Amino acid sequence: MAREVFRGAIPNDLLYDIRYDMWVRNDGDEIVIGATSLGIFHAGEIIAFTAKPRGAVIDDGRGLGTVECAKTILAVHAPLSFVLTQANEEAESNPALVNTDPYTRGWMVRGRARNWNEDRAALVDAAAYRRHVLAVEPDAQIE
């Protein structure tokens, strides 16, 4: 059976966490976090997303919520330390957005970074993330 080829985007204006295939956008006083198209490709179609409650203090690498896929429930790991200020209610009620529009309407949470300068150093730019994607998925078709 032929292996499915990854096809997805890697926007240039985001930062990426290679450990968890998550993206981060610095949005003024807050950060916005979501799953990358590669992370979604590996997890499988997301059929439910639930974020931790507003005000939750999330440490780097700890769960910011969960996603339910066809055969499993997975923790969504935070790419940095933050205080959760808003979950994307639209994505929680319509998780298909996470699959089809992960970088705009399908974002997962917003928050206030707790250690931005330190945590930022562990994130990579789009060029480095593209190299990571091609190392993991050599036949990837990146938009």
Residue ranges and their predicted role:
Residues M1-D60, T100, R105-N115, A122-A127, ...:
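Acidic, low-complexity mobile loops and tails
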Residues D21, G55, H77-Q86:
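Generic structural motif
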Residues N26-D29, Q86-N94, E118:
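Short, conserved beta-turn/loop elements at beta-strand boundaries and strand-helix junctions
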Residues G39, T72, E92-S93:
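A short acidic/small-residue loop/turn micro-motif
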Residues T50, E68, L74-A78:
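Small beta-strand-rich domains/subdomains or short beta-sheet motifs embedded
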Residues I58, L64-G65, L84:
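Generic structural signal for buried aliphatic residues
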Residues I73, E118-D119:
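Short beta-strands and strand-coil junctions in structured, solvent-facing domains, enriched
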